[in-house]
């Protein structure tokens, strides 16, 4: 099961517009990837043990590195570029140039493949949000 949306953002989906920067990487101007990486971290921090933008690996306009520890205690170094996110190492701040892993368009898709506990946390957050919307609708 791929989860390509953040349950915390469901209430803002009505503001979704064609061509918006929120639609992903295609068709947008070059971004500062460090800022993009910070946004990625803030989106999914609730569903992992630890996640932060690397301070020791070079960030630039076109690339940033994110360290993540899943709830299963597996550590990864992720590369964020205009192409998306991919695993580049199996430890914090580690880049293995020989590692061949696929790019994922979203952090949700990437974590969905790496962490069953992420899927569970995402599903629980989604359920809580839907229950809150239901309660608000009944008031």
Curated annotation (Swiss-Prot):
Transmembrane segments: none annotated. Changing residue 115 to A: No effect on GSK3B-mediated phosphorylation. Reduces to 30 % GSK3B-mediated phosphorylation. Reduces to 30 % GSK3B-mediated phosphorylation. One of its GO terms (molecular function) is protein kinase A regulatory subunit binding. Changing residue 109 to A: No effect on GSK3B-mediated phosphorylation. Reduces to 30 % GSK3B-mediated phosphorylation. Reduces to 30 % GSK3B-mediated phosphorylation. The record marks 130 as: Required for GSK3B interaction. Pfam families: GSKIP_dom. GO terms for biological process: intrinsic apoptotic signaling pathway in response to oxidative stress; negative regulation of protein kinase activity; positive regulation of canonical Wnt signaling pathway; regulation of Wnt signaling pathway. Residues 1-22 are annotated as: Disordered. The keyword Cytoplasm applies. Phosphorylated by GSK3B. Residues 41-45 are annotated as: Required for PRKAR2A interaction. The keyword 4Fe-4S does not apply. It is found in: Cytoplasm; Nucleus. One of its GO terms (cellular component) is nucleus. Detected in heart, brain, placenta, liver, skeletal muscle, kidney, testis, lung and pancreas. Its main location: cytoplasm. Keywords: Cytoplasm, Nucleus. Residues 115-139 are annotated as: Interaction with GSK3B and acts as a GSK3B inhibitor. PANTHER family: GSK3B-INTERACTING PROTEIN (PTHR12490:SF4). Belongs to the GSKIP family. A-kinase anchoring protein for GSK3B and PKA that regulates or facilitates their kinase activity towards their targets. The ternary complex enhances Wnt-induced signaling by facilitating the GSK3B- and PKA-induced phosphorylation of beta-catenin leading to beta-catenin degradation and stabilization respectively. Upon cAMP activation, the ternary complex contributes to neuroprotection against oxidative stress-induced apoptosis by facilitating the PKA-induced phosphorylation of DML1 and PKA-induced inactivation of GSK3B. Forms a complex composed of PRKAR2A or PRKAR2B, GSK3B and GSKIP through GSKIP interaction; facilitates PKA-induced phosphorylation of GSK3B leading to GSK3B inactivation; recruits DNM1L through GSK3B for PKA-mediated phosphorylation of DNM1L; promotes beta-catenin degradation through GSK3B-induced phosphorylation of beta-catenin; stabilizes beta-catenin and enhances Wnt-induced signaling through PKA-induced phosphorylation of beta-catenin. Interacts with GSK3B; induces GSK3B-mediated phosphorylation of GSKIP and inhibits GSK3B kinase activity. This is GSK3B-interacting protein. It comes from Homo sapiens.
